[in-house]
Amino acid sequence: MQDTEHSTIPGASLPIGLRGIAYYVGSSVPIQELSCLANNAELLERFKAAHFRNFSRSDISLPEQAAHCAQATLNKCGMQAGDIDAVVIGFSELREWTSYPEQLTYAILSRLGMNHIPVVGVTLAGCANVTSSLRVARNMIMVDGYRNVLVVETNLLRDDRRRLEGTAPGATPENVFGDGAVSFVLTRDNDTADFDLLAMDQIVSYTEGEQTTIQDVIATSTAASRRVIGRALDQAGVQREQVKCVLLNNMNILMMAALFRLYGFTHADFHIENTLRYGHVWSADSFINLHDYCETRKPLAGAHFLLIGHGNTYYSALVLRLRHSASDAAQAN
């Protein structure tokens, strides 16, 4: 196993808040509509056993779904386009073959009424890409002095034949990709934030050699995820027992659930219901799951959340702390 580490900043030095999580997903489509599953009953049952039932298929364009959820974020924050100092746009899968990324950026920002504003594009990190986008936004606040940075992560597949993907060359597919986008604002104004960003960690880790097996990949993935989880919790000064919920991304739930049991987490600590509805919406999963968990469970202020980005090569962990409970927000309004 080889991994690449980057220096991390202790949670205490992250005076950054996060607010206004919103998301867009496409229509929920049964996984048996995918021809390779419709014609393979054994594989179909394997996916159902791994909590996959449906995937999200977008009926709007990549920039439209990004702008849709970004506008929802602004509305939740009570903000206008002019309140945003910079934008970070993340893509993991670029399938708008008729457009250059620059044109897609214009298509997103023009829908939001944003002009003359710094924009950074972030890609490459796959299922951990939203963490890369968040890291860039945090640095823009801490280093460049911006106050409010809008983060948008958007992905869409035009070809249903590519929705199933294995974790190693020639391996049996392990997840079903869905279309969707997620957005939020990273802010220096902590008093207005929904969450405190306490810590983040992210590494590249892969198995070398031409004879890589699925067992090798699982071993590498497990070690990498355990590493970033442990370091993020240490940076945040948070014990496992203090974590209210683990927000998994929806890739290979069975493997990740087994991994987290090594830490002493139980099924009750996970929020994985969205896997049944959306499939694996790339790196947006954990924030979508966090949004829905807080909407349905109404956790109290001070609750800690562990968000996981678990991919084939990139792995990340975030620790957030809820600043205001649902009752607090209701009283404020």
Stretches found by the model and what they are:
Residues N39-L44, S99-G113, V151-R163, M256-H267:
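Acidic-glycine-rich active-site phosphate/pyrophosphate-binding loop
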Residues T8-G11, L112-M114, I141-D144, E174-G178, ...:
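Solvent-exposed alpha-helices and their adjacent loops that cap or buttress functional pockets
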Residues A86-V88, S110-V122, E165-P169, T266-E273:
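Glycine/charged-rich beta-loop-alpha catalytic/anionic-binding loops adjacent to active sites
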Residues C69-D85, R226-K244, Y263:
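Phosphate/pyrophosphate-binding loops at sites that engage ATP/ADP/AMP, CoA/4′-phosphopantetheine
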Residues A67, L94-P101, N115, V122-M142, ...:
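Claisen-condensing/thiolase-fold acyl-transfer catalytic domains that form or cleave C-C bonds
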Residues A81-E96:
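Membrane helical hairpin/interfacial module
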Residues M140-N175:
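Flexible, glycine-rich active-site loops centered on histidine and acidic residues
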Residues M1-L62, R163-R231, H310, V319-N333:
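Condensing-enzyme catalytic core mediating Claisen C-C bond formation in acyl metabolism
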